[in-house]
Amino acid sequence: MFCVQCEQTIRTPVGNGCSYAQGMCGKTAETSDLQDLLVAVLQGLSAWALKARELDIIDHDVDNFAPRAFFSTLTNVNFDSQRIIGYAQEAITLRESLAVRCRLHDATATVDHPMAALQLAGNDIPTLLQQAEDFALDSDKAIVGDDVHGLRMLNLYGLKGAAAYMEHAHVLGQYDNAIYAEYHAFMAWLGTQPTDVDTLLNNAMGIGKMNFNVMAILDHGETDAYGHPQPTSVNVRPIAGKAILISGHDLKDLRMLLEQTEGTGVNIYTHGEMLPAHGYPELKKFKHLAGNYGSGWQNQQTEFAKFPGAIVMTSNCIIDPNVGNYGDRIWTRSIVGWPGVNHLEGDDFSSVIEQAQGLAGFPYSEIEHMITVGFGRETLLSAADTVIDLVAQKKLRHVFLVGGCDGSREERSYFTDFTLSVPQDCLIMTLACGKYRFNKLDFGTLEGLPRLLDVGQCNDAYAAIILAVKLAEKLGCGVNDLPLSLVLSWFEQKAIVILLTLLSLGVKNIYTGPTAPGFLTDNLLAILNDKFGMRAITTVEQDMNTILAA
């Protein structure tokens, strides 16, 4: 195997990347290699989707399937080799069906692409693993060099992140043909093994720009369905009663679960990136949406083991449920998979509910501990004039966006320490699961505004971008001239594409950590620093002094 897509990848003096029997995430070499083969098949499918569009053929089955299958290869999403093979088989079936449609329209229709006619060598895992060796992501690294390889990975992993957001938006009924056309173009292009550095850099920015549009339709999909988030207090301590825990990003799954558990006596708790759900009017109206349970995803093996109910994983992040001996209580949805655990097909949660009713539940209610969420796009925009007035009165010195992914690396304590060191005349915005490093702390208020503003999930970076643009317009300056600094933690591919989105929009001087992506060479990091001022975090004191002195 060779996988270098997440922050916890193995790093050695001779090179970075997981390349043994199992990756740091728990993904086996078998699953990793089969995912590489799936990616190659999906690149061929995208090549045919582009040809079809030339002939005015848009196959919605292909558009719906392709990003979803690609999403399954993200970190901590699907560890089930058989389901990865199933995606590859389905991709070939869709590709051949689309090719037939193209040839009915134009008998000479062909696609000149190295993956356009790729067939699986068999149905058994040993045969497919042998075939997958030809599609290892580092197969020609020694030939093209570390910089080209690193840029390919930047594009590939960024596109994976965008594909995940496309799937989240699709679940909510959002579709934009222009976005899907761009996605297929980038995916097919990556299948040609590009080597031109300038093209690779430009297309990475192109993927970032595309993702801004993806986040926009996802934002509208969520707010159209569930209303605009409102500041809402959330209890992070359990109450007595039967319980189901739901994790991931899929608000539609949460809505269905809430509807199906209403009146059953089962309380629903959010976990991880599902926390922002409590701010949506159409979700928080359910009285049995009891609160939020747990902390960052990396602690789930301990926290899920203690949860006395059923658990539903709607998207990333899942890790080995057998370690905490709760594999029989966890259920996967959609693209999520772990070998041997229950997988829910369709929209009927009755099996989960029945299991929860048969489990102990929480024996008593703990003393409440409330945190506040729900500072979404409309709420932020409504506060824009207040923020501007406070800046003008010199009552608000600076705004920090401290967010991104959480993880297990010890150095991530930086983000807790950083927020605690933010001066009292400054505000902190946060989003994504990195917030669990500090979101239960009391930061107080500034002139009536909470000093900690929870914007939402990782994709709600869109709301923060919209606020920054609006503030810049009102102040007659550029976004980079605002008293605003971004301090971002990364772990996986969604964070990569959000970084690309910010860079593509011209946002500069972003601080990132806890480490640089393992696929970015020193040369590439120097380019990003030179073009965008992107820099690695150092110490809290040094970074804070640098930011406030600017």
Swiss-Prot record:
Catalytic reaction equation(s): A + NH4(+) + H2O = hydroxylamine + AH2 + H(+)
Modified positions (Cysteine persulfide) in chain numbering: C405
Binding site for [2Fe-2S] cluster: C3, C6, C18, C25
GO cellular component: cytoplasm
Gene Ontology biological process terms from the UniProt entry: response to hydrogen peroxide
GO molecular function: 2 iron, 2 sulfur cluster binding; hydroxylamine reductase activity; metal ion binding; peroxidase activity
EC number: 1.7.99.1
Cofactor: [2Fe-2S] cluster; hybrid [4Fe-2O-2S] cluster
Keywords carried by this UniProt record: 2Fe-2S, Cytoplasm, Iron, Iron-sulfur, Metal-binding, Oxidoreductase
Sites where the protein binds hybrid [4Fe-2O-2S] cluster: H249, E273, C317, C405, C433, C458, E492, K494
Co-factor binding details: Binds 1 [2Fe-2S] cluster.
InterPro entries hit by this protein: HCP/CODH, Hydroxylam_reduct, Prismane-like_a/b-sand, Prismane-like_sf, Prismane_a-bundle
Main localization category: cytoplasm
Compartments it resides in: Cytoplasm
Xref: Gene3D superfamilies: 1.20.1270.20, 3.40.50.2030
Function in brief: Catalyzes the reduction of hydroxylamine to form NH(3) and H(2)O.
HAMAP family, alphabetized: Hydroxylam_reduct
NCBIfam families: hybrid_clust, PRK05290.1
Stated family: Belongs to the HCP family.
Full protein name: Hydroxylamine reductase
Gene: hcp
